Design a protein with these regions (language model features):
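N-terminal secretory signal peptides that target proteins for export/translocation
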Residues: 1-6
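Short sequence/structural segments immediately N-terminal
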Residues: 22-345
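Bacterial N-terminal signal peptides
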Residues: 8-21
Length: 346
């Protein structure tokens, strides 16, 4: 084993010993493997499917073959290729998967040959996640492991629209478990996150406007260290993008009160998955106003919310008047482009 690799994986805490040798540097062009020949010629679609899928896998493109993960001797024909004495592993047990992937992906020197920009702390992060802890501490067979999100034989880079972790695919990938009510029943957590997210301004910005920088599941929950944002830091998560709003909220009276009540800052008013585009209608005590969830017309906060809404409505009315005046002036032949530009920022 290469030095430093066990240290990187030791925190996984799995009582699993893999006899599979570490993959050597992959050749520029992977030699033909008996695995491929047999799996394609046996007439069993179940066995042929992985081979066909792997043809477009990022690992195949880098020169890795079946034996890189499954072990054995691909130069041998027949059953001799699957000799346990030569490190043949076959289909890894679910608990083996993070350690198996981490043999390469946790080794900075090895990964530098193929993608120096790729992080090598994925396994370290995974063991701190809800998924990793349940796998390590409870042996939970249903939690996500590497191949749950990255299909074992069809892994593509996130930039590939066909990838399961392309920004437009992440929500569906997470939802393959988290939107499956029977599958998630033992965990007693909601399963409507995907449905709600697809009604959010974040999803619409990404899917309809094509802005792939809009947040999806992993932007708020993390990739490999996935965890639900806690009450104490959900505002920090939102603040990664909404910096100015986070700073203003932190200085507000609401921030102190929400902390005392144990209420999550941003999500209390904006929800967490079904986040709507902010509008004037959210302010005040009318239908759809979020202030009404806590304030009533008779309390000081309710009066303040109603007054602010009235000011905004008045401003909107004045803005509409100004727009009408400028339109009339333009029709009369006046140059009003600068005024129209400034009015757009109102």
């Amino acid at each position: 084993m290469r030095p430093g690799s066990l240290a990187a994986l030791g925190g996984l805490g799995l009582s699993v010993s893999l006899s599979l040798a570490w993959p050597s540097a992959a050749p520029a062009q992977q030699a033909a493997e008996s695995c491929v020949t047999c799996h394609l010629e046996m007439g069993d679609d179940r066995l042929a499917a992985p081979v066909k899928a792997f043809a477009e896998d990022i690992h195949a493109a880098k020169g890795f073959g079946c034996a890189s993960c499954h072990g054995g001797d691909p130069k041998e024909a027949g059953m001799e290729a699957m000799d346990p004495a030569k490190g043949y592993l076959g289909k890894p047990d679910r608990q083996q998967v993070p350690q198996l992937c981490g043999r390469c992906h946790s080794d900075a020197r090895f990964m530098k040959r193929y993608n120096p920009a790729l992080r090598v702390d994925q396994v370290t992060e995974y063991v701190t996640s809800v998924h990793g802890r349940r796998l390590r501490e409870l042996g939970d067979p249903k939690v996500a492991v590497c191949v749950s999100c990255h299909p074992a034989h069809a892994i593509r880079p996130p930039s590939d629209p066909r990838s399961s972790v392309h920004p437009l695919k992440v929500a569906e990938t997470c939802g393959s478990c988290h939107a499956d009510a029977p599958y998630m029943a033992p965990y007693k957590i909601p399963t409507d996150q995907l449905q709600k997210y697809k009604g959010s301004v974040h999803w619409k910005t990404m899917a309809e406007k094509g802005d792939l920088s809009a947040p999806t599941c992993n932007d708020c929950h993390g990739n490999h260290g996935a965890a639900p944002p806690g009450i104490s830091w959900v505002g920090n998560v939102c603040g990664q993008c909404h910096t100015v709003m986070a700073e203003l909220f932190a200085k507000s009276r609401h921030a102190k009160v929400f902390t005392q009540l144990g209420a999550p800052g941003c999500a209390t008013c904006h929800e967490n998955h079904e986040i709507k585009e902010a509008s004037d209608e959210m302010l005040g005590l009318g239908e759809g106003a979020v202030c009404a969830a806590c304030h009533a017309a008779g309390d000081k906060g309710g009066k303040g919310a109603a007054d602010m809404r009235a000011l905004l409505d008045g401003l909107r009315g004045e803005t509409d008047k100004a727009r009408t005046i400028l339109l009339q002036a333009e029709h009369a032949g006046m140059e009003v482009s600068q005024a129209q530009f400034e009015l757009k920022g109102a």
